[in-house]
């Protein structure tokens, strides 16, 4: 899932019943994080590195 601000998305995961599987890390020109939603679905979150 492409997002504009990965930090904001990750900060909202746990308070809303989800889990951070992998904290944000740099992958080429992207920031990537893996999260699990409250239903157990694993999702990749991506943000383009702008600088």
Spans of features found by a protein language model:
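Vicinal oxygen chelate
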Residues: 10-51
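Short hydrophobic/aromatic beta-strand micro-patches
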Residues: 2-4
């Amino acid at each position: 899932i492409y997002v504009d601000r990965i930090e904001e998305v990750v900060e909202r995961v746990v308070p809303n019943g989800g889990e951070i599987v992998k904290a944000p890390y740099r992958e080429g020109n992207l920031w990537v994080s893996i999260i699990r939603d409250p239903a157990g679905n694993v999702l990749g979150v991506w943000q383009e590195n702008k600088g």
